[in-house]
Amino acid sequence: MKLSNKTQALHDLIAPAVQACDVNLWGIEFIPQGKRSLLRIFIDKPVDETAEPVLNEDGETELGRGIGVQDCVRVTQQVGAILDVHDPISGEYALEVSSPGWDRPFFQLEQMSAYIGQQVALRLISAVENRRKFQAKLLLVDLENEMIQVEVDGKHVLEIDSHNIDKANLIYQD
């Protein structure tokens, strides 16, 4: 779960602007696509179980948690201005801002800690037991040793080095 140098540089550049919008930068994806690249920014807010419902600027009721359209608009404006000034992406690009959603991608090992016991989808760089793709139950996140432990097929436990994880996301379950 390591960001490329370009993605890390973009992350470092936009993080203060996102934070200024009172949301958390969950992660970013930078996808170079020839003449037109894509910069996708995921933002999140901590859950506030005690929040009272309020009307937002669009007249919608918000429960004090989750990302709303106005959050995405604010971040898009702030980050867009930063990118216009610093011009870190050569050529044209599209900027997308959204919440991580129910099937949220994980960008850092620490993010997975809150989802122990949940189902995750993993794509590995190098095969483990002749497989690169897994859907498994997350059992353990070991930050010190930079590894996770998952249960595959309800019975088989694997330890996976975080540096071997190419992509990971939560599997939404109703």
Curated annotation (Swiss-Prot):
**Main localization, broad class:** cytoplasm
Q: Which cysteines are joined by disulfide bonds?
A: none
Q: Gene3D superfamilies this protein is in? A: Ribosome maturation factor RimP, C-terminal domain, RimP-like superfamily, N-terminal
Top-level taxonomic group: Bacteria
**InterPro entries recorded:** Ribosome_maturation_RimP (IPR003728), RimP_C (IPR028998), RimP_C_sf (IPR036847), RimP_N (IPR028989), RimP_N_sf (IPR035956)
The Gene Ontology biological process annotation of the record reads:
ribosomal small subunit assembly; translation
Which keywords does this chain's UniProt record carry? Cytoplasm, Ribosome biogenesis
Q: Where in the cell is it found?
A: Cytoplasm
Report one GO cellular component: cytosol
Pfam families linked: DUF150_C, RimP_N
What does the protein in this record do?
Required for maturation of 30S ribosomal subunits.
Which protein family is it in? Belongs to the RimP family.
The molecule here is called Ribosome maturation factor RimP
